[in-house]
């Protein structure tokens, strides 16, 4: 997985349960800049059929890497209600 030393978990809430999660996941993956890595994407059931997507994004502890920047890009997508960085951990 390269020389990444951080993993940031970004939780994305779709606008409603009818959103196609497969399409949304692919759309969001395309927004992650190339210098980052993607370890995995998980689906987290919330309530009333709503499912959040959790992106485990790999980065480095150095200038130029910002998980908040990725969350902001995710937030600009029409089907996204919210996107926030839940945690950032060393790996």
Curated annotation (Swiss-Prot):
Q: Which UniProt keywords apply?
A: Elongation factor, Protein biosynthesis
Q: Which molecular function GO terms apply here?
A: translation elongation factor activity
Q: Which InterPro entries does this entry report, sorted A to Z?
A: eEF-1beta-like_sf, EF1B_bsu/dsu_GNE, Transl_elong_EF1B/ribsomal_bS6, Transl_elong_EF1B_B_arc
Top-level taxon of origin: Archaea
HAMAP family the record matches: EF1_beta (MF_00043)
What this chain does, per the entry, is described as: Promotes the exchange of GDP for GTP in EF-1-alpha/GDP, thus allowing the regeneration of EF-1-alpha/GTP that could then be used to form the ternary complex EF-1-alpha/GTP/AAtRNA.
Q: Can you tell me which family this protein belongs to?
A: Belongs to the EF-1-beta/EF-1-delta family.
Q: What is this protein called?
A: Elongation factor 1-beta
Source species: Pyrococcus furiosus (strain ATCC 43587 / DSM 3638 / JCM 8422 / Vc1)
What is this organism's lineage? Archaea, Methanobacteriati, Methanobacteriota, Thermococci, Thermococcales
């Amino acid at each position: 997985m390269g020389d990444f030393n951080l993993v940031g978990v970004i939780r994305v809430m779709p606008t409603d349960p009818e959103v196609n999660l497969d399409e949304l996941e692919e759309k969001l993956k395309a927004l992650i800049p190339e210098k980052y890595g993607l370890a995995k994407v998980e689906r987290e059931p919330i309530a009333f059929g709503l499912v959040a997507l959790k992106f485990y994004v790999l980065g480095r502890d150095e200038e130029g890497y910002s998980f908040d920047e990725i969350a902001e890009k995710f937030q600009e997508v029409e089907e996204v209600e919210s996107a926030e960085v839940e945690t950032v951990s060393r790996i």
